[in-house]
Every structure is written in C-alpha cells, then in structure tokens.
C-alpha cells in the first residue's frame, strides 16, 4: 500500500524513529531503510537518550526523549540532507558512514522522505514540514482550528493577535455577535485571549459549481 499509493504524486512522508525495523521477530535496520528510502545504521552497545538538535532559519532547538531508547538509528545516506544531529556533540560517533545525523530529508522523483530518529517532534517543526508539503495552515500559533465549508471555529492558545490565514478570499462574521470581521480577504486579524473560542461564519457562501450560484 505504501509503495503503490503513498510514494507518488509529489507527496511528503514523515517517518518517526524506526518504522519497519521489525522483520521476522527481530530488529533489522534494512526493513527501515527499505520503507523510508533513507539509509541508516543501528548503533550497537548500551541504550541511551535520543535527542536531536536542529538549526533552521537561525533558530536552534532540541527535541526527543531523555529516556534510554533501543534501537537507536543514525543517518548514513550521502544522498540525503541532514537537518538535525545528535545533541551530545559534533564528533563522528558511529561507523558505516554515520556522522550523527538524526533528522534527514531525501528527495525522490515522485515523493519526498523525511525521517526523524527522535520521537516527540515539536508542533512547530511538524507545521513547517506540513506547509512545505502543501498543507494549508490556518494559524502558526498552535491554535486548534476546526474548519468546514462555511464555518471556522478556533480555540485560542494565546493572549495576542490571531492572524487567521484563509484558503481563499471571503467575507466572514462573528457567529456570536454577527459583526463582520473581514470582507473579501484571505487574512483575518483578531485580538484573542487564551482559552477563548472564536466561531466564524462565511456570509458569501462558495458558489455551487453545478448551477453557478
């Protein structure tokens, strides 16, 4: 199913930790390599933490788990682009071509593979990969957004200005007060408070393609 239905049409697939590594009841890193298309090696020895350090657009952060984890995989693919590294240091820790890469991106003719050795990827990084893959993001603040054809509900996380990015220009009003908040625009800016629920109603419904209305 993955090979026939997912790895095509320009899709991006994000893999976490060690997908496909169980073969015939044991750890087999070649199963992971075949599934993700990214060559990795499995570290030998004792269990240890899995924390990845990332530097993107000048912003440095780490994610993963401090718990002892096994198996531990490290990227060793010269055709892949390393986006994150083992946090413990810049030394080359393992053999077989691995250099400590723990977040790797590799492009194929029909799809893109992104693999993260560490779990617990933060929402900001997930959102970045989703947006690059063509997913429409309504908010970059981490608000919960529940969209439908002519309604949008938002559960707000911050005491700040919400900038809601709409998929297309339209006119929207506050469903509680009937106040028009934006006209013929694909951007809405609204002062919000943490825990507030915003419900928007579109008042220029999308045309029905069957009758042009």
Where are these regions (language model features)?
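A conserved amphipathic helix/loop scaffold
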Residues: 1-213
